[in-house]
């Protein structure tokens, strides 16, 4: 595949950031984490990024438009973000990847990363999934449960090396 960029999405704690980081290091490609950039963008505009329901629609749209333009102008770059695979649907040279894993794995990762109880992590993940689903459906009519066509789905419940290698082989 003649991919100029790799675009990775997935629900919280699905392993999308881990995959993006692994690929970036192995391929020596630039890495852009959309969520991290969005939080910076919000702060620069005087908005608390942790209060998702208070972020104006226009802030989301402006950021996503900038990200989409950047994707279109990039080469040898990995973009990771919740809806990045939808934002890149018109880019024929993008390898688009969806990270999928089961709820137990997501909760376990949250416990390890955040130091919270399993119950708190389950609640946090459920709330985040619901908020994200509502936000992106309202903004773009994106249903996170319905992937766009042409997306490679990887099971991220196994060690990252196995599915990172699968993606690298597709680039050859």
For each predicted feature, which ranges?
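ATP-dependent small-molecule kinase phosphotransfer cores
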Residues: 30-90, 103-104, 115-120, 130
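Glycine-rich phosphate-binding P-loop
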Residues: 8-23
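Small-molecule kinase domains that catalyze NTP-dependent phosphoryl transfer to phosphate-bearing small molecules
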Residues: 62, 86, 118-166
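Conserved phosphate-donor/acceptor-positioning beta-strand/loop module used by diverse small-molecule
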Residues: 92-114, 124-126
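Pre-Walker A (Motif I) flank of P-loop NTPase domains
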Residues: 2-6, 75
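C-terminal alpha-helix
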Residues: 166-172
């Amino acid at each position: 595949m003649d991919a100029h960029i790799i675009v990775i999405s997935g629900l919280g704690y699905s392993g999308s950031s881990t995959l993006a980081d692994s690929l970036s290091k192995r391929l020596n490609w630039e890495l852009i984490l959309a969520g991290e950039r969005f939080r910076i963008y919000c702060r620069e505009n005087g908005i608390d990024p942790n209060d998702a329901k208070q972020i104006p629609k226009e802030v989301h749209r402006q950021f996503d438009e900038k990200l989409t333009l950047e994707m279109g102008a990039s080469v040898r770059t990995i973009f990771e973000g919740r809806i990045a695979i939808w934002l890149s649907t018109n880019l024929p040279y993008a390898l688009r990847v969806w990270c999928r894993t089961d709820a137990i794995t997501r909760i376990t990762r949250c416990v390890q990363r955040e130091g919270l109880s399993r119950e708190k992590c389950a609640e946090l993940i459920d709330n985040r999934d619901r908020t994200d689903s509502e936000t992106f459906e309202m903004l773009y009519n994106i249903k996170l449960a319905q992937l766009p066509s042409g997306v490679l789905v990887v099971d991220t419940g196994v060690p990252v090396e196995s599915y990172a290698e699968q993606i690298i082989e597709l680039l050859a």
